[in-house]
Amino acid sequence: MKEVDWWLIQISTDYVFGKEPYNIPCGPAQKGTPTGVYGKTKLHSEQKIIATGCIYIIIRTAWLYSEFGKNFCKTMINLTATKPALKVVFDQCGTPTYALDLAHVIITIIEKPQVGVFHFSNEGVCSWYDFTQMIAKIVGNNDCDIQSCYSSEYPSPVTRPAYSVLDKCTIKETFYVKFPYWIDSLEKCISI
């Protein structure tokens, strides 16, 4: 049988960091402390991939959205257009990631692969409230009264990290990738 140099690429998540109260960006080497099933299974699969000794690339991302499928951006476009008022969490911060930007980075990485765990999201930081405000502004849904609320007021079956900003230094230094600012990418997504 012929040996082949295959690369295993896994797209992972900020959920591997759990609900720890970080106030600095999470680095690729930082220990994961997931609390939910999704985060635990993602971290477990990362560990298994690394333990196999295969040639791997793990890309963690966060707050992923696009013009397709079900996601926060599309939901907020709909809700701000149809609801007179809306409460959105302001005490969880991160960086939205446009799926098209992630796709471009994956292609860049495939062209010059390097083994490792890397983080990718767009640039900047915002809360879910800030993200919603910007979505409504871009699409012109100005009639909805968007109010901020604590995450404790909005029960969720999923435990999200309170501060899920990803440290992207390693991917920048390894692949020389440019990271669009989250608002620029959001405008691009919505204009499509």
Which ranges hold each PLM region?
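Helix C-cap/helix->beta junction micro-motif
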Residues: 3-4, 52, 139
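Mid/C-terminal beta-alpha module of Rossmann-like enzyme folds, strongest
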Residues: 112-158
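Structural signature of the Rossmann-like NAD(P)-dependent dehydrogenase/reductase core
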Residues: 9-12, 57-58, 95, 119
